Amino acid sequence: MTRLTLALDVMGGDFGPSVTVPAALQALNSNSQLTLLLVGNPDAITPLLAKADFEQRSRLQIIPAQSVIASDARPSQAIRASRGSSMRVALELVKEGRAQACVSAGNTGALMGLAKLLLKPLEGIERPALVTVLPHQQKGKTVVLDLGANVDCDSTMLVQFAIMGSVLAEEVVEIPNPRVALLNIGEEEVKGLDSIRDASAVLKTIPSINYIGYLEANELLTGKTDVLVCDGFTGNVTLKTMEGVVRMFLSLLKSQGEGKKRSWWLLLLKRWLQKSLTRRFSHLNPDQYNGACLLGLRGTVIKSHGAANQRAFAVAIEQAVQAVQRQVPQRIAARLESVYPAGFELLDGGKSGTLR
């Protein structure tokens, strides 16, 4: 395995270094070829490294940063005031070639804007998209994008997302000839926004995309598609709704019957069912798929959930490792060139319209 260096914005997220630094140590234990640059306030980071052994410390470096971008800051304001912030410094390390990827749990809008400013989109990509890999009931995985980087998307962007998602499904998830679908309010051709229907028409003409049509939100976890494409507003709401339902379900499994008097055999049956069902559905736990890749840039950027715990942030670090190892940006660029050798104009500016 090739040695990798990642830059971590350890100050970002709801819990900052108290979660990100222990997660960094966990990631180092799991990968002997990994070096981590911890970007943030040294006074906040150093005490949390007390339990790190000599070998771990040899693969850690603290990169000082003067400030933190607030989670509630407007993206435009955050970008203007970003110099010296932990997020910007981490991204600059990628731009300078000192790190191969950046991981942050900070402000999504600021991360999107700064990454686009510093790392630049690939040729043929208008705007990057946030993408994650979700488990489904068939024990497989589905690539979903956009998850919030772009609230409003025209048809051209949706087609670009489909191309990028298809590459990620092939190269990282290792799904041959992945099926691609557009998230819509129905499966009929006439349903949905103009942007969705226009994107559908274009995807049907691209031989390298295994486009299967529309998919409704209630089929997200069924395994009917390998790549699901949507605008960022829809994707973000869909993802958070799904996460909330899964967390509620797992919580109910653990708490069912608490505080009630039951016979000993009912208690044994309850415990057996809890363990069995928890094992059966543990792959749906949101902590196990934390980390959305900002796809479409000339570098690798992973956005962790702001409320991620130690385990979840360590998963986001692993997502960055996989993206770098599989050379995702380079492979997307190659796919775009093969699909559109004469240029990258896909549509004549198709805009989102009204529902039908």
From Swiss-Prot:
GO terms under cellular component: cytoplasm
Main location group: cytoplasm
Enzyme nomenclature, EC number: 2.3.1.274
Keyword Cell inner membrane assigned: no
Domain of life: Bacteria
InterPro entries per the UniProt record, alphabetical: FA_synthesis, Phospholipid_synth_PlsX-like
One Pfam family recorded for the sequence: FA_synthesis
Record-linked Gene3D superfamilies: Isopropylmalate Dehydrogenase
Alphabetized SUPFAM superfamilies for the sequence: Isocitrate/Isopropylmalate dehydrogenase-like
Pathway terms, separated by semicolons: Lipid metabolism; phospholipid metabolism
Broadest EC class assigned to this enzyme: transferase
Catalytic activity: a fatty acyl-[ACP] + phosphate = an acyl phosphate + holo-[ACP]
Keywords for the protein's UniProt record, in alphabetical order: Cytoplasm, Lipid biosynthesis, Lipid metabolism, Phospholipid biosynthesis, Phospholipid metabolism, Transferase
Entry's localization field: Cytoplasm
Biological process, per Gene Ontology: fatty acid biosynthetic process; phospholipid biosynthetic process
Functional note: Catalyzes the reversible formation of acyl-phosphate (acyl-PO(4)) from acyl-[acyl-carrier-protein] (acyl-ACP). This enzyme utilizes acyl-ACP as fatty acyl donor, but not acyl-CoA.
Protein family per UniProt: Belongs to the PlsX family.
Subunit record text: Homodimer. Probably interacts with PlsY.
Name this protein carries in UniProt: Phosphate acyltransferase
Lineage start: Bacteria, Pseudomonadati, Pseudomonadota, Gammaproteobacteria, Enterobacterales
